[in-house]
Structure formats: structure tokens, C-alpha cells
């Protein structure tokens, strides 16, 4: 049985539309999550506690969109080490709860804070859709 060319072209068009729709949905999700991350980490009015509390969301964003985040190799290695260390620290339990304080406390005033700043800068710098701060080139 021969399938008419018209039916095949309609089927092909439908498949292309579905694939484009899925990609657009992923882009919208990326943009939404990126905006949330930038609202927290690119806003000087947000306190350190809020930034530290949102580190798991930052890590999840990095894991979900690794190809979209352009870090130099050295920063990427440091970031991967930070993620591994942070994840390990959250899995260690003390009296049935994750350990409090330790190396994660005041994380944003340390070299890890600088690494997070580089991560946020890469989101702003390499993505043309990200609004730049007032006065930025």
C-alpha cells in the first residue's frame, strides 16, 4: 500500500511542530529558572542567609542545564568540586539531620562565594537574553 506524499508531509510537519514545541517549553523553563536564580544572587538587597538557603536550587539549575552555562575549565572544575563537597555535607546526618554550620556557613564570604559569583556572571555574560545591570556595557 502506498501512502500519499501529502499524508507523509503532514505527518512530518506535525512531528516538527511537536519537537519545536518541546524545545520552546524547555527554553521557557530555563529562562524562568535563570531569572529566579538571578533575582536571588544578582540582587544586593538579598541577604546571605537567603543566598545560602538557595544553594541547592543553584546546584540543581547547574545540573539541569550544564551545556547552557559557559564557565572556563578551571572554574568548572572548582564548581564541580564545590557541588560534590556540598552534596556530601548535606548527606551526612547528625542526630538524623544534616550537619549545621561547618564549611558551608558564611559560604558567600569565602572563595566559594567568589565561585558562585563567577557562575552568576557567566549566566549574565554569555546569555544575550539576560538583562544587564544599569550602567553595564
Swiss-Prot record:
Subcellular localization(s) per the UniProt record: Secreted
Protein name, as recorded: Protein Turandot X
Cystine residue pairs: none
Family annotation (InterPro entries): Turandot
Record flagged with keyword Glycoprotein: no
Main location: secreted
Role according to the record: A humoral factor that may play a role in stress tolerance.
Taxonomy of the source species: Eukaryota, Metazoa, Ecdysozoa, Arthropoda, Hexapoda
Segment forming the signal sequence: 1-24
A GO biological-process term: innate immune response
Pfam assignment, any one: Turandot
Amino acid at each position: 500500500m502506498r501512502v500519499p506524499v501529502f499524508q507523509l508531509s503532514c505527518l512530518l510537519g506535525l512531528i516538527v511542530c511537536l519537537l519545536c514545541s518541546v524545545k520552546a517549553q524547555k527554553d521557557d523553563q530555563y529562562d524562568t529558572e535563570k531569572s529566579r536564580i538571578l533575582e536571588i544572587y544578582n540582587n544586593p538587597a538579598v541577604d546571605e542567609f537567603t543566598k545560602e538557603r538557595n544553594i541547592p536550587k543553584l546546584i540543581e539549575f547547574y545540573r539541569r542545564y550544564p551545556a547552557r552555562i559557559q564557565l572556563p575549565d578551571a572554574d568548572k572544575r572548582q564548581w564541580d568540586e564545590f557541588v560534590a563537597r556540598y552534596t556530601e555535607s548535606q548527606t551526612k546526618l547528625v542526630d538524623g539531620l544534616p550537619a549545621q554550620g561547618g564549611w558551608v556557613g558564611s559560604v558567600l564570604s569565602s572563595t566559594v562565594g567568589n565561585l558562585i559569583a563567577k557562575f552568576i556572571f557567566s549566566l549574565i555574560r554569555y546569555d544575550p537574553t539576560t538583562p544587564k545591570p544599569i550602567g553595564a556595557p
